[in-house]
Design a protein with these regions (language model features):
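Terminal leader/tail segments of proteins
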Residues: 1-106
């Protein structure tokens, strides 16, 4: 995991606003939700017992890396985003499902 991704996860865990380079975490205290942005595009919302993931309009390696860092720290064991034949999928306990922007993981 990259240093920026460790810092991003620390901000999410500690419910803090944080920004470095192209990545930003905004903490919404009223909703108790962390929102993660990459290049100003929303890529994740993290609640107390759920994660909602987005591609931000760009299915890039950087987006996938940030999402996987979030899932490794805040998701369930084995959850990850991967690419096969140019299509994104989410690996979960029950197997792989096609990725769609806005999908919610519990």
């Amino acid at each position: 995991m990259r240093k920026i991704e460790r810092q991003m996860n620390a901000a999410i865990t500690n419910a803090k606003d944080w920004c470095s380079g192209n990545t930003q975490v905004c903490w919404d205290g009223a909703a108790q939700v962390a929102e993660v942005f990459l290049h100003g595009n929303l890529i994740a919302k993290i609640g107390s017992c759920w994660i909602q993931i987005f591609d931000g309009g760009w299915q890039s390696n950087t987006t996938k890396s940030r999402l996987n860092a979030i899932l490794s720290e805040h998701g369930l064991p084995g959850e990850c985003v991967f690419q096969k034949n140019f299509n994104w999928f989410v690996s979960q306990e029950g197997g792989a499902v096609p990725f769609f922007s806005g999908m919610r993981l519990n």
